[in-house]
Amino acid sequence: MTLLIASSSIGVIATGHAESSAVSVGRELAHSYDHGNCLACHSAPTDELAVTLANIAPPLLNMKERFPVRKVLFEYIWDARNTNPDTIMPPFGSHEILSSSEIHKIIDYLYTL
């Protein structure tokens, strides 16, 4: 029985670590010059690690409140042209700049802002 409790505790720790890891990877992708590079156009005023002078696109603030339906934000990052044909935002998913998994990790990070 002690072994079962220890296994349960490890499972909880692993789950918490996985969530933290997804946010961390999402932050790295959003800050990366060769992948997401969100900071090329967006500022992230509440992220002290996001150093940018960008003001081309809306700031990355209150993202969970602005996009309460995760799928809407995913589809916008995947290919914003589907919503706004005149957008200057790159179609990250449809042009294979980011994978579906990477976009989900970026959203995990954005939802902390």
Put a short name on every predicted segment.
Residues 71, 82, 93-113:
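C-terminal capping alpha-helices of c-type cytochrome domains
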Residues 1-9:
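Bacterial N-terminal signal peptides
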Residues 29-33, 62-64, 95-98:
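Flexible gly/pro/ser-rich segments immediately N-terminal to CXXCH heme-c attachment motifs
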